[in-house]
Amino acid sequence: MIQRHELCKDLVAWVFNNPDQPQSLEGVIKELHTTRASLSQGCKESLGIGPMEVLRNIRLEHVHQALKDPEIRQRLNVKSVEDIRKHYGFQSRGNFAAIYADYFGEKPYATMKRASKTSIPN
């Protein structure tokens, strides 16, 4: 169980340390030198959710940060919610907006708009 718990920690660390890398489950499994079953069981034991949901939640956090921070958008060369959504691998516009709103309590466009109102010009 300790090894599976460590796999989940490694998954979270890898995704946070590689935010600009494509983050497919198969790619992460390969990076972590593990199996889908071990990673799945480790995530469920540690966090109560599967690795796909872990990946999705972390990607949502990355999206949220990019929507709030113009410096991140500039570094990634993305300008719109649509660009950010695509950059982080969310395929369906409608599904993405619904998932984002459930997770953060507001639509992605509202996050970006609110952030632009509160940012202080240089």
Walk through the language-model features, giving the residues of each:
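Basic, amphipathic alpha-helical hairpins
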Residues: D10-Q23, C43, L47, Q65-V78, ...
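Helix-turn-helix/winged-helix DNA-binding modules
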Residues: Q3, D20-Q21, L55, L76-N77, ...
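Basic/polar phosphate-binding segments, predominantly the helix-turn-helix DNA-binding elements
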Residues: E26-E61, R85-K107
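Short, leucine-enriched amphipathic alpha-helices that occur as contiguous helical runs
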Residues: R4-V12, R56-H64
